[in-house]
C-alpha cells in the first residue's frame, strides 16, 4: 500500500489550498479517528497541539470536528512544541496525538502529523492505511457516541516540568547568559521559562508571534538575529529553535553557528566516554557530513545512515536499540528522553556540557572539520520527473565517476516541497563546484 497524501513528515501544503483545506482536515481527522477507534470501540482520547500559524485555528477546528465525528474525545493543547505532543500523547494515555505545523516553513504553509499511543510518529504503513480509509466512505459514530472536545491548560506546563527532569540532577545554569530564539513559534513561552527556571540569564528572541511571523527572519533557519543578540549582550551561547521546536542550531559566544552534525558529534563523544552511547552507534541521515563519519570512526564509533527525515532516524534507532541520532538540519533525537527530535532538550544537553566542563561554547561546538559540502535546490513543476530524464541521468553518472573515492554525491527529491536537492562533498572544492553546477543545470533544463 503506497502513500500519496503523506510526505516524509505528515501532510503539508499551503493553507487553504489542497491538501491543507478545512474540508481535507475534517476528512483526515475522521479517517484517523476511524483508524484509531474501530467501529464499536470505546471513546479514546486524542491530543492536538499546534504552532503559532494563523491557519492553525482553522485546521484545529476542522480536525476536531472530524475526530469527534468518529467518537474520539479531543484534548486541545494550544501552541506547544511538536515533541510536547509526542510526550503528552503517552503521558495522558491518548490513543493518538496530532501536531498542526509546517515546522521551519513560512507561515503560509501548514501541516498535520500524527503520533501513535507510544508517542512515536506513525509508520509509513499506518499512514497508508489512513489514506485508504480517507479514500472511501468514512463511517461516523452513532449520535450517542460522538466525541467531546475541551481545551486543557496544563499541557505546556507538564512538558516544561518534564524537560527540567532531563537536566542533570543538582546542576544549575546560574551565571550563564543564554540567547534563546523561538522563531515566533510553538516554544515561545516554554523554552524561555525552562531556561530561566534552571537558573540562566535569558535573552529571548522571536517570542512575539502574530500568526504571520513564524520563522520570519528568526529561528534555526535564520539565526542572524540571535547571533546579533549574542554579540550585543555578550551572551555565552545562543539556542535557535524552529517554528515547532523540534530542531535546534547552537551559536557560540561569537555568534558562529554549529549545526546538527556538530551537536551530535559532541553528544556522541561525551556519551561514549560516559558509557551511555548504545553499541557505540550514532544514527544520522545521508545528508550528514563526511567529517562526522570520520570523527566517529577515529574514536571507534560507528555512523548508521538513513534516508532523510527524522522519522527514519527514529525508526532505525528503534530497530537497532540505539539512543542517539539526528539530522544535520538540527533534529536531535535522544530516545532516552524523547520520542522525536526535541530542540529544547538538545539545547539543555549542550548547556549541561558547558556547565559541567566550564568550557566555552566555541570549544564544544567544533568537534570536527567539515568536508566541503555544497547543496543546491532546484524547483520543478507539479507532475514533472526531472530525475528520470536521460540527460540528467547521464550527467549524474559522469559526476559519480569523477567523484569516485574523492567525495560523495547525493541527489534526491524533497519529501515536503517540489524540489530536487543536489548535494556533494569533496575536498577538492573546484571539482565540487563543477559537479554540482553541471547537475543543477541539467535538472533545470529537464524541469
Swiss-Prot record:
List of residues binding Mg(2+): 103, 242, 244, 246
Pfam family of the protein (one): PGM_PMM_II
Essential cofactor(s): Mg(2+)
Entry GO terms, CC: cytosol
Post-translational modification: Activated by phosphorylation.
Keywords associated with the record: Isomerase, Magnesium, Metal-binding, Phosphoprotein
Enzyme class: isomerase
Domain of life per record: Bacteria
Gene Ontology MF: a single term: magnesium ion binding
Repeat recorded as keyword: no
CDD domains, sorted: GlmM
Catalyzed chemical reaction(s): alpha-D-glucosamine 1-phosphate = D-glucosamine 6-phosphate
InterPro entries xrefs: A-D-PHexomutase_a/b/a-I, A-D-PHexomutase_a/b/a-I/II/III, A-D-PHexomutase_a/b/a-II, A-D-PHexomutase_a/b/a-III, A-D-PHexomutase_C, A-D-PHexomutase_C_sf, A-D-PHexomutase_CS, Alpha-D-phosphohexomutase_SF
Family indicated by similarity: Belongs to the phosphohexose mutase family.
Name of the molecule in the record: Phosphoglucosamine mutase
Amino acid at each position: 500500500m503506497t502513500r500519496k497524501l503523506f510526505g516524509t513528515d505528515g501532510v503539508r501544503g499551503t493553507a487553504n489550498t489542497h491538501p491543507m483545506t478545512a474540508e481535507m482536515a475534517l476528512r483526515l481527522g475522521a479517517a484517523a479517528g476511524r483508524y484509531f477507534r474501530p467501529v464499536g470501540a470505546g471513546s479514546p482520547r486524542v491530543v492536538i497541539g499546534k504552532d503559532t500559524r494563523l491557519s492553525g485555528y482553522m485546521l484545529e477546528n476542522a480536525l476536531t470536528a472530524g475526530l469527534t465525528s468518529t467518537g474520539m474525545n479531543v484534548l486541545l493543547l494550544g501552541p506547544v512544541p511538536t515533541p510536547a505532543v509526542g510526550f503528552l500523547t503517552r503521558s495522558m494515555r491518548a490513543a493518538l496525538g496530532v501536531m498542526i505545523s509546517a515546522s521551519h516553513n513560512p507561515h503560509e504553509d501548514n501541516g498535520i502529523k500524527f503520533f501513535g499511543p507510544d508517542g512515536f510518529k506513525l509508520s509509513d504503513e499506518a499512514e497508508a492505511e489512513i489514506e485508504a480509509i480517507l479514500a472511501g466512505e468514512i463511517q461516523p459514530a452513532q449520535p450517542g457516541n460522538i466525541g467531546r472536545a475541551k481545551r486543557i491548560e496544563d499541557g505546556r506546563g507538564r512538558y516544561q516540568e518534564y524537560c527540567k527532569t532531563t537536566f542533570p540532577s543538582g546542576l544549575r545554569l546560574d551565571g550563564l547568559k543564554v540567547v534563546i530564539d523561538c522563531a515566533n513559534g510553538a516554544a515561545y513561552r516554554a523554552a524561555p521559562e525552562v531556561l530561566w527556571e534552571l537558573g540562566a540569564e535569558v535573552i529571548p528572541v522571536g517570542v512575539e508571534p502574530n500568526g504571520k511571523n513564524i520563522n520570519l527572519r528568526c529561528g534555526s533557519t535564520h539565526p542572524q538575529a540571535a547571533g546579533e543578540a549574542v554579540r550585543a549582550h555578550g551572551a555565552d551561547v545562543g539556542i535557535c529553535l524552529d517554528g515547532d521546536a523540534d530542531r535546534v542550531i547552537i551559536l557560540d559566544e561569537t555568534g558562529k553557528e554549529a549545526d546538527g552534525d556538530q551537536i551530535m558529534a559532541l553528544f556522541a563523544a561525551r556519551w561514549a566516554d560516559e558509557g551511555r552511547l548504545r553499541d557505540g552507534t550514532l544514527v544520522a541521515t545521508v545528508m550528514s557530513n563526511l567529517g562526522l563519519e570520520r570523527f566517529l570512526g577515529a574514536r571507534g564509533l560507528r555512523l548508521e545512515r538513513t534516508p532523510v527525515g527524522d522519522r527514519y532516524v527514529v525508526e532505525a534507532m528503534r530497530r537497532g536499540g540505539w539512543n542517539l541520532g539526528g539530522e544535520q538540519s538540527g533534529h536531535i533525537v535522544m530516545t532516552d528522553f524523547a520520542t522525536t527530535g526535541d530542540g529544547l532538550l538538545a539545547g539543555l544537553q549542550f548547556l549541561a556540557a558547558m556547565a559541567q566542563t566550564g568550557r566555552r561554547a566555541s570549544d564544544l561546538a567544533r568537534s570536527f572539520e567539515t568536508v566541503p559540502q555544497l547543496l543546491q535546490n532546484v524547483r520543478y513543476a507539479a507532475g514533472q520527473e526531472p530525475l528520470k530524464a536521460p540527460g540528467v541521468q547521464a550527467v549524474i553518472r559522469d559526476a559519480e565517476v569523477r567523484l569516485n573515492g574523492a567525495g560523495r554525491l547525493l541527489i534526491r527529491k524533497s519529501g515536503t516541497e517540489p524540489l530536487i536537492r543536489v548535494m556533494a562533498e569533496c575536498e577538492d572544492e573546484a571539482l565540487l563546484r563543477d559537479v554540482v553546477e553541471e547537475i543543477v543545470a541539467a535538472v533545470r533544463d529537464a524541469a
